[in-house]
Amino acid sequence: MKRFHSSLLFLLLSSFVVAETPPNIVLLYSDDAGFADFGFQPNCRPDVKSLTPRISSLASAGARLTNGYMSGCVCSPSRAGMMTGRYQERFGYDNNLPPGTKDGLPLEETFGVKRLQKLGYETALIGKWHLGYPEAFHPNKRGFDWFYGLLQGSRPYFPMPKPTPHRVIQENGKATEEIGYVTDRLGDAACRFIRENKDGPFFLFLSFTAPHGPLQPKEVDARKLSSIEQKRRRNYAGLLVSLDANVGKVLDTLKSEGLDENTLVIFTNDNGGQTQLGANNFPLKGKKGSLHEGGVRVPWALRWPGKIKPGTVIDDPVIALDLMPTFIEMAGGKVEESWKLDGVSLLESWQKGKPLAERPLYWRKAGSSGDRAMRLGKWKLFHGRKENTPPALYDLSKDVAEEKDLSASNSEQLKTMLKMLDQWESELTEPRWGPGKG
């Protein structure tokens, strides 16, 4: 598959291994947003096309990735994969972490952010954690110097009278006052972190809860959207407006502090859009919780001034497992074989425009009796074991909506991929909690 449309990537004069000033890294996550709900996406729905100009500016000033994936189809597992660079099913993290569970991402697993700390980076997580509730699993214990956010997967956007310890916005373990709109609070905290660490280098993971439910937009945002007739879609869109405004705050702060030229900014979403709450994943099949494309393929945009030319389109399949290896190499570190990462560094590919070698991407949910899927080049295999349906094979280069099963006419391709998928699954453990628990 051709990776870059024309010669769109600037060559670097030197690598970051010897750079005097390592780049800052800002990773922006939305939550449960739709594949077709951001203006930079070619299939963005008309009703929200103009609502995300600041997020879309990242793609126009940098790159849009057409085949960007998460390693999980729901919130918590996808974060577990990204944070470690390893398929989360290797350590039993198939399912969302239930509220109050006395468990989390196994302590034996190393977060990539801890490795960034060792390379001299100041690190922050602002927003949603969802990777463990007991003290041993706290973000401050897993590699984040500063944590400002909530431990649980969601909460109301407006102040709560008596928030539980897992839903209150805390700062390094201490509850903060319930005041203000959550998306604004997270955006303001991110700007504060940038200003206080402008001498860098820093890694900021801004993990918004928007537009995850509950659908509680600010009234001022909802009033702008009267043209959207369906109330659910209108309220969802209101959450996008606030999300975009706060991404804008972050971009403005980087610029005002003189940091934008030496900062990589990546925007993506944690899993497929939740259509039941207003998201739109057109033209993909499926939604959050599904291993069809609509559950795991997500919007990706990135800006890296002087390194990636404005308007670049990257077609190579990439997955969030690749982020931490990439960041470590950007920081001047070396990815060790002993870490047994599944993700690969994208740095050389981004720097030199080299296509990535073809590799399989895998998914599983709910253990060895749940659904599983795989992508290899243009081929997508989906095996719906939960409904006891036979494996299906799709050609994504012609059928991104997964409508035409080609398994009967491509039996050898199906056989090869099933063998690879079986081998991968033999290396996994059963879920630690939830459906399929071992």
Predicted features along the sequence, with ranges:
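Bacterial N-terminal signal peptides
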Residues: 7-15
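Formylglycine-dependent sulfatase
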Residues: 4, 16-392, 396-438
